[in-house]
Amino acid sequence: MEKDLHLHEKKCLAHEAATQVTSGMILGLGSGSTAKEFIFALAHRIQTESLAVHAIASSQNSYALAKQLAIPLLNPEKFSSLDLTVDGADEVDPQLRMIKGGGGAIFREKILLRAAKRSIILVDESKLVPVLGKFRVPLEISRFGRSAIIEEIRHLGYEGEWRLQDTGDLFITDSSNYIYDIFSPNSYPNPEKDLLKLIQIHGVIEVGFVIEKVEVWSSNSQGLISKKYSV
């Protein structure tokens, strides 16, 4: 029942976000279950309104779904800016700082967020938290020298574990890297400091803290949408 409720919230958010798309836009498609609903809503508008847009997908899963739904896709090596990126998040604090990357696509997701003139993050209200840290923070790690990289991370006081596939093998991202999920018993009241320390480690390719200028749209169980804007 709770799963169905969250799905309803995601669909409401996705359809509202799709109304922000106009012909001629180049869009960034996020990853995860909420971004998936946005891709469906976008495809519906393209099919019913002859909307002319192009998109860049942040993951192979989003790419495959967009292609299946006949959303025109661009070469990810060729774009320089985006009009709008729509994605989800794992946690959002009152300052709209986020933890993202639960699906393992944080490196590509951040590229799309930073390239976009406007970014909309869609979450159900359960993702709004007073302080970040209940959700583990994914680090995208180089496969080369991974054990040495983890030693540096632990030296800074962070504990974690390698993300695994269902087979028990190490999870490999679409960019052919590993994911190391860190956790903190004290949460992250100052994620900017944690982000700066971690990203300076050579071999840490990306960190799942997101501190960008974004709009966060949240929905409650009644389908009411609240919009907040970072400054």
From Swiss-Prot:
Keywords: Isomerase. InterPro entries: NagB/RpiA_transferase-like, Ribose-5P_isomerase, Ribose5P_isomerase_typA_subgr, Ribose5P_isomerase_type_A. CDD domains: RPI_A. It holds the Pfam family Rib_5-P_isom_A. SUPFAM superfamilies: D-ribose-5-phosphate isomerase (RpiA), lid domain (SSF75445), NagB/RpiA/CoA transferase-like (SSF100950). Pathway: Carbohydrate degradation; pentose phosphate pathway; D-ribose 5-phosphate from D-ribulose 5-phosphate (non-oxidative stage): step 1/1. Substrate binds at residues 31-34, 87-90, 100-103, 127. GO terms for biological process: pentose-phosphate shunt, non-oxidative branch. GO terms for molecular function: ribose-5-phosphate isomerase activity. It is an enzyme of class 5 (isomerase). It catalyses: aldehydo-D-ribose 5-phosphate = D-ribulose 5-phosphate. Its EC number is 5.3.1.6. The active site is at residue 109. Belongs to the ribose 5-phosphate isomerase family. HAMAP family: Rib_5P_isom_A. Homodimer. Catalyzes the reversible conversion of ribose-5-phosphate to ribulose 5-phosphate. PANTHER family: RIBOSE-5-PHOSPHATE ISOMERASE 3, CHLOROPLASTIC-RELATED. This is Ribose-5-phosphate isomerase A. It comes from Chlamydia pneumoniae (Chlamydophila pneumoniae).
